[in-house]
Amino acid sequence: MAGYTPMIQQYLKIKAEYQDAFLFFRLGDFYEMFFEDAKKASQELEITLTSRDGGSSERIPMCGVPYHSCSSYIEQLIKKGYKVAICEQVEDPKSAKGVVKREVVQLITPGTVMDGKGIHENENNFIASVSKFQHTYGLAFSDLTTGENLVTAIERLDDVVSEIYSVGAREIVVSRNLDEKDVAMLKERCGATISFEDEQADEVPGIVNGLGSKELVDTFMRLYVYLKRTQKRSLDHLQNVQAYELEEAMKIDLYSKRNLELTETIRSKNKKGSLLWLLDETKTAMGGRLLKQWIDRPLIRKGQIEERQEIVETLIAHLFEREDLRERLKEVYDLERLAGRVAYGNVNARDLIQLKESLKQVPAIKQLVGSLDHPKAKARAEKIDPCGDLLNLLEDALYENPPLSLKEGNLIKDGYHAKLDEYRDASKNGKDWIARLEQQEREYTGIRSLKVGFNKVFGYYIEVTKANIHLLEEGRYERKQTLTNAERYITPELKEKEALILEAENNICELEYELFSELRSKVKEYIPRLQQLAKMMSELDVLQCFATISENRHYVKPEFSDDVVQVIDGRHPVVEKVMDSQSYVPNSCEMGKGRQMLLITGPNMSGKSTYMRQMALISILAQIGCFVPAKKAVLPIFDQIFTRIGAADDLISGQSTFMVEMLEAKNAIVHATKNSLILFDEIGRGTSTYDGMALAQAIIEYVHEHIGAKTLFSTHYHELTSLEEKLDDLKNVHVRAEEYEGKVVFLHQIKEGAADKSYGIHVAQLAELPDGLISRAKTILKELESGAKEAAPSTAPNMVKEAAEEAAATVADQPAQLSFFETDKPIEKETKLSKKEQAVLAEFKAMDLLDMTPIQVMNELYRLQKKLK
């Protein structure tokens, strides 16, 4: 380091404290980066890499970004999971002796972004912290933008991952002592930036006082210390830490949240197409965030659910009041994040105008809710604090359209402060004198084109064209600037007035900034009240959203029972919306004593998976307090939902379809209770036929005998339908399909009993495979069916058992997966194929269909079809 210049030595000393971050080092109007930071940043940001002399023998790599446009560059780096340390000059370069003093004023990380495009208005930006104790994990969350704080204790790391996934935390703070396997699992499965914090807190803030448990306090304090260390500013807006337990809400594991597409779709990872997308009729950003939180954590206490339902029902019954409420809420800005900006000290005058405009709507909202004919609505109205004193303060202090900058004046109203009014009078009088000066000088000189102007470089001046210079009195005018066609002058009187005006304007700007800072401090005292008001507004917003969607889409109020499921003409809410004008086929679902499990058979693409998801989404809608898409709905309150639905297979992670199946099935089998809902879609399809059938039956029997949960189990193993005779609580249902003129028609209707046949070849026909290939497949199918009938055992369950034993005994002598197309018979002459068709058939025969998802099969069929065309 000794060979470098003093400035580079300063850079290296600061950089040593922020090894895991890009150091934005302020040099004049730029943030500069050096050495490895510069090389990496030039690639990530696609900016020019240069170099400079740093005192050593080799030039130092360097790149930089303008400070006034740094936000977009910081957002790019944060979006990629990096951290950025902002290093500012903290003394005036003019008064500095030697190198200007610099220090890091903020560390921006994925979990601590406060504004800009990196923050989505309808989403929280939670940062998480994970601690390991003897028997549990401690998990804490904080959102700096809203001040929300949560903490819980969890036994299993899988549940920790699921919670982090639910809230979408982009950064996880852990101790360096946390097990490396745990850290690796958190990073891989949550896709978040991992940060380390092992410092102890100097003092414990009051926001943790209500937690009680030392483990919960320690968990949150790790996060709090990290935030204090990185943000280096007030965290006064952080709300009291709320302790919660997973058992207080319906548990939906990570797999199931993905499978059900609650907040984002599986394939595109977008909101559009998810349940959140369907429901989001909120009018405020904070309402949008609360809606997502409610979807992630459905209620399990009947009283809480019914309170929401009753207000939704009341809002449905009062259309005009609801529409008025929606219009009022639309004018309410993001109170939570405005409060956060106030606490952070980066709120500007326009932010406070937004706060003022929001507060103007509150009295009318309070009156509207209080006018609703329901005691719970009236009780909510009573709790709304309009913050009238804050509104009056903002009304008195601020102009309606203040500038973005806080140091250019025009922020504070006339009459708010006597000294400010005095300065403004002095400035106005001086400008009036200057306005009169122009007319006086024209009359005095006789030059009609003479004018008085101002610019920031030369101040006030008298401008005269060169053709009229001879008319000026000698000795009275002092030349100030020469232009091509004119000269600019100043007089002693003008110079004197200019000094008075500029002094007054400088005093105005300084005093306005001082008064605004005082105003900001006064507003800071209202933060707890504003956060409580934001909570009330966001809840009203979500409830009106439920009422609006329920009325517009003809949903019904669900009833709750202890054990009965009775959904009459239920609809999948998202599919129904996507189909729009097309005719949606509703389906009913009845479960209860003697009918706890439904075994669903039917052809691929007939709607089995949609029917199963429909049941889960209706249950979730009911338990968040919304009405549901059905003619009638009676439901138990489920404590957990588990799904195994193939569309969510993620083979990129290196796990086969079958392994994913087994892991998800295990999760349900180990953790489900009799009050849970289980959805199993074609379990066993990821392995050989006999293995798959044996496992599917074993899982059905285990859930039936040992868990007793309400279960929807779809299968393509038609042999399993005979289990209805053996298991008291299992019933067969099927998706109806009919053949018409040799073609299959999917009716998408759920009917009692088992499906009488499969329609796999018809699906291949829909994909437009060659006629010869389809004909050959039909021939092979007849041969297989004929052979199966000759060897058929007395009952399907016995067949499964014997098949499994046979598979185990012969596995050493047989290939891992037999092709259904292996046969000694050649393709007959009447179905002779072209060379192209033969090549496609060869590819088709080589496909390992039993180890592919339906979607993968359809994609392969589409590819083969394109080859033939």
From Swiss-Prot:
Stated name of the protein: DNA mismatch repair protein MutS
GO biological process: mismatch repair
Signal peptide: none
Species of origin: Bacillus licheniformis (strain ATCC 14580 / DSM 13 / JCM 2505 / CCUG 7422 / NBRC 12200 / NCIMB 9375 / NCTC 10341 / NRRL NRS-1264 / Gibson 46)
PANTHER family, sorted: DNA MISMATCH REPAIR PROTEIN MSH1, MITOCHONDRIAL, DNA MISMATCH REPAIR PROTEIN MUTS FAMILY MEMBER
UniProt cross-references to PROSITE patterns, sorted A to Z: DNA_MISMATCH_REPAIR_2 (PS00486)
Chain sites annotated for binding ATP: 602-609
Taxonomic lineage of the native organism: Bacteria, Bacillati, Bacillota, Bacilli, Bacillales
InterPro entries: DNA_mismatch_repair_MutS, DNA_mismatch_repair_MutS-lik_N, DNA_mismatch_repair_MutS/MSH, DNA_mismatch_repair_MutS_C, DNA_mismatch_repair_MutS_clamp, DNA_mismatch_repair_MutS_core, DNA_mismatch_repair_MutS_N, DNA_mismatch_repair_MutS_sf
